[in-house]
């Protein structure tokens, strides 16, 4: 009888006994994401940690549990706190800045308009969210998904106090970003002719080192003076770029664009996936 009781307790402690149909569906979704990331190589740096975080939390929900009394919270809960306080998105921007060459943008300022086109997606998502019954702040947080920008989506959701929506927004934004290689080609063919796709781009003018150094400094001053609340994201983006272009802090540039960037991607990806 003792052996049977022990076996019964063991069965009750397994994930199989405690999971709901919703958990099994999300486990299947996580496996699909892993397949797309590993087999199809669709944004594996994003999809692998997101999918694995999703897998873990749906088998063992306590891994995202908040601390209760003297009992510590789950591991991924502490990763997620870094999302809520906008620490990881800001560090991601610093890494992106350290990897980005703004030379083509400086040489051809008209290309700023390409980035402005993202606003159509943002406003479209905003009005769609309003029509679906979301409040103003919730719709504003959701709208950034339309710009396919994961770190900014997380940052704005936190700033607007929409922490209950932060997880779904982050998963939607990063899933959208990861699926761009699937979504983009058919849309490119739909919106352009074969002749337009064969247009040969002209060589842009050379950009001096002084221009590249001044660019992050000037952008930071102008943007933050106009919109002070953008300082965490714009400031970190331009700081990373200044590391790259100054040429005097090579170690910081390499760390921001490599080791630190990949550590942050792991923390951000697993915590975002676990928030589902």
Each language-model region and where it sits:
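Intrinsically disordered, low-complexity non-transmembrane regions of multi-pass membrane transporters
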Residues: 1-18, 24, 186-215, 248-254
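N-terminal alpha-helical transmembrane segments of multi-pass membrane transport
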Residues: 1-71
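Interfacial helix-loop-helix linkers and transmembrane-helix boundary segments
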Residues: 38-47, 66, 78-79, 99-114, ...
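Hydrophobic transmembrane alpha-helices of secondary-active transporters
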Residues: 56, 82-106, 240-243, 261-276
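Alpha-helical membrane segments and immediately flanking helix-loop junctions
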Residues: 85, 93-99, 114-124, 128, ...
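Alpha-helical transmembrane segments
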Residues: 164-182
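Core mid-bundle transmembrane helix pairs that form the ion/substrate translocation pathway
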Residues: 177-181, 188-244
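Transmembrane helical segments that form the transport core of multi-pass membrane transport proteins
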Residues: 220-276
């Amino acid at each position: 009888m003792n052996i049977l009781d022990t076996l019964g307790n063991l069965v009750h402690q397994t994930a199989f006994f405690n999971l709901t149909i919703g958990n099994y569906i999300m486990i299947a979704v996580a496996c699909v994401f892993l397949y797309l990331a590993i087999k199809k190589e669709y944004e594996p740096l994003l999809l692998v940690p997101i999918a694995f975080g999703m897998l873990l939390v749906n088998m063992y929900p306590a891994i995202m549990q908040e601390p209760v009394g003297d009992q510590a919270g789950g591991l991924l809960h502490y990763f997620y706190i870094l999302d809520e306080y906008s620490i990881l998105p800001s560090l991601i921007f610093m890494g992106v800045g350290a990897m980005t060459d703004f030379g083509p943008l400086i040489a051809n300022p008209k290309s700023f308009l390409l980035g402005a086109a993202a606003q159509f997606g943002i406003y479209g998502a905003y009005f769609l969210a309003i029509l679906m019954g979301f409040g103003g702040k919730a719709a504003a947080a959701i709208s950034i998904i339309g710009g396919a920008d994961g770190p900014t989506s997380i940052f704005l959701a936190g700033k607007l106090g929409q922490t209950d929506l932060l997880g779904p927004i982050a998963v939607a934004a990063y899933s959208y970003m990861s699926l761009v290689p699937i979504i983009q080609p058919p849309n490119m063919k739909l919106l352009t002719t074969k002749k337009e796709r064969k247009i040969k781009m002209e060589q842009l003018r050379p950009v001096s080192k002084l221009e590249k150094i001044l660019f992050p400094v000037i952008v930071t001053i102008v943007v933050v003076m106009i919109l002070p609340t953008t300082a965490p994201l714009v400031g970190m983006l331009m700081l990373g770029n200044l590391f790259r272009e100054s040429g005097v802090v090579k170690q910081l540039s390499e760390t921001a664009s490599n080791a630190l960037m990949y550590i942050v991607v792991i923390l951000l990806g697993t915590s975002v996936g676990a928030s589902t």
